[in-house]
Amino acid sequence: MGGAENAGLTIATADTQDGTVFYLGTHHPHWLADERFRAVPLFISSRRLRNRKTLPRAVGRWALDSGGFTEIKMYGRWTITPEQYADLICWYARDIGMPDFIAPMDWMCEPAIIYGQNQHLKQTDRRYFHGTRAARGIPPDGPDEPLDDAVRKHQTWTVANYLALRKLLPPPLNQRLIAVVQGAHLPHYLAILGMYADAGVDLCTLPRVGLGSVCRRQHTGEIAEIVSALAARGLRNMHGFGVKTDGLDLYGTHLSSADSQAWSDRERHRGYPRFPECVGVHKNCANCPKAALRWHGNVLARLTRARRRPSQLSLLNLNEVTAA
């Protein structure tokens, strides 16, 4: 297939000199087969793939997101079973090519995910959060449970799904599946380390571990505290899911890889095409390959420069990149 097929279970060095991989998030499956993205690792959700009749053959590296945030945000539960997801993964790997890694059917732990938010809006509205009250067995007319108890349930389901998928997937796909640590606050993240250990999983020996429930945090200092604490306990192989890119200067040194689709949101909010040749073609560049490639290229260029500066703490601050 190309780079992904030969990537093995190690962090490849195709993107930066020190081996940090920055995956470009995209909602366009056909980009996998686009030669323009051969050298750009892509991160794509199963929700964008699973209803297709045919799949594109990837020309470069890619990784699979389970789409868990959207699933639980919209429905308060998973709408597919682990068995169905395992079958989908096998299909993707066969037709697209072997992914660098596979995200499990984890359960995010942000308070909005747990308790719901803006439920008067349409389910498809970005501000709508269904809440997991029903999944947690809480009666609709009764008081909800404390955050710590709800997080514990989400974490228990996250660990259980990782164990289940590891058994359902054939090798080497089961080795590409990554465990994910979830939590609402730092003590929760530390607690799930023990939950994995109790299940016989030593996260420090895995080739990659996902860091979840960080994409909507407003305070990058809190994320930095969580990442640093996990790294101090031996997790030096983390992938940051949908990381808040303007905080990577605080915690990026502890991440082996990360993904972001911030380019698309940035272009959507811009409200008009970025490039002259796009005027009259589309109203903005939220779906534009050229905009995505330019953003990713700027990220990598700044990342490399930042790594060369001894005083630089981590990957880079992407505020300037997203404004470029």
What is each stretch, according to the model?
Residues 1-164, 315-324:
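Non-catalytic, usually N-terminal nucleic-acid engagement modules in DNA/RNA processing proteins
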Residues 1-35, 67, 167, 198, ...:
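Alpha/beta catalytic cores of nucleotide-metabolism and tRNA/nucleoside-modifying enzymes
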Residues 56-57, 74-83, 97-104, 215-220, ...:
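Low-complexity, flexible helical/coil segments
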Residues 86, 90, 178, 190, ...:
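Generic detector of well-ordered alpha-helical segments enriched in charged/polar residues
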Residues 90-258:
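Eukaryote-skewed repeat-based solenoidal scaffolds used as protein-protein interaction platforms
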